[in-house]
Amino acid sequence: MIRQCVILVGGLGTRLGAATSTTPKPMLTVGDRPFLAWLTREVVRYGITDILLLTGHLAEVIRAGLEGLREWLPRAVTLTISEEPIRAGTGGALYHAREKLHDGFLLLNGDSLFDCDLSPLMTEEPGVLGRLMLRRLADASRYGVVEMSGDRVTAFQERPEPGSPGLINGGVYRLDRQVVDRTSAMCSLERDILPDLAWDGLLRGTESDGWFIDIGVPSDLYRAQREVPQRLTRPALLLDRDGVCNVDHGWVGTRERFEWVPGAQAAIRMAHARGWHVFIVTNQAGVARGLYHEADVLALHGWMRDEVLRSGGLIDDVRYCPFHPEAVVPAYRRNSSWRKPAPGMILDLLRAWRLDPNQCVLIGDRPTDMAAATAAGVTGLLFPGGNLADFVRPILDANQTEWPV
């Protein structure tokens, strides 16, 4: 599973004039934060733990802004910089960062945002060195266009005439580190590397109709001020785990005892496809009782997230409470504001992800879940059992005033 995201943040931004004379494009304010903070927040949803920024022009501004960027992230990740020694181009930036790259990594343009499902990029593919996310535009004249045969990228063409439709590179990639062997100290990924990969049959593409914006021109930077916060401030589905996501066999702490509730993965896929966050909030008193270890819970939740991601869904984040006031294990014997019916886990997610409580629904199977939802100020819905996808579908179809309490 891919854990590193590399972001190109060294462009000059000449089309934006004075706006980028002292500020790199990715650090321009969009809504209430730097544009780059929106990008990094999105990739963290997919389990990325290492973000590497490839800097050039005004690198000192990026470096000075690192702590501010970390404050916008919903959870801690490694956030580092690779600075090119000269103006090296997009391929050259990868070349100079080669010692810091994972075997497989995501690559993003730092001045565009493609709100698409990244799950096709999150696993490596044998015999393939890269996969691109592609967007079909009615007017592709600002960009080069991509030619395809099935899902194989066959060629890249120059910008078409104004008003011409085409399939464009959305600036979101998964690349194998072997691609860097084809780069040099000064080269362009788009002009020098990707066309050769396509010619050699090593490049694949996935088309998405997700929302796309490139802030490289003043009109789109202006449009981004309203549309980026509007589109990326998402509703959230919060799921209890035992009895909602998995069959409650009692004290499920390992994969061996884990069984998905019918429709659980489908429900998560549906919510993700509709643009919702999906979170897990679960009491795990089995740790306090000594039935399994906290490391077992973490491993199980990591496996759940990877399984869902492979199926095209996404669990954005997980909160669990291992404490119990009558714990057998002394280290876990205490009252906790995170243990439902207390709302601590939900409140922490609201804070970390900057969620609107009015746009959040918690689904649980016990009165303690409903009490926690009420205390946190979110809607709570009691799951009676059966197929979770059938239960979730009308919630996604309705707006918050119609949720079936």
Name each region found by the language model.
Residues M1-I7, R15, T29, R33-N109, ...:
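Conserved N-terminal catalytic core of the sugar/cofactor nucleotidyltransferase
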Residues F105-L106, L113, S119-E125, L137-A140, ...:
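Catalytic-core segments of class I nucleotidyltransferases/pyrophosphorylases
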Residues P235-F279:
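Active-site neighborhood of HAD-like aspartate-dependent phosphohydrolases
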Residues R33-D50, A64, G263-G275, W303-S311:
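A short, N-terminal amphipathic alpha-helix
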Residues L54, A264, I268-M304, L314-A327, ...:
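Substrate-recognition element of Asp-dependent hydrolases with the DxDx(T/V) motif
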Residues A295-L298, G302-D316, P325-L362, R366-V405:
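Asp-based, Mg2+/Mn2+-dependent phosphohydrolase catalytic module
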Residues M1-S21, Y46, L202, A236-D242:
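N-terminal nucleotide-binding beta1-loop-alpha1 segment
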Residues R131-V145:
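Short beta-strand-to-loop element that shapes/binds the nucleotide-sugar donor at the catalytic cleft/hinge
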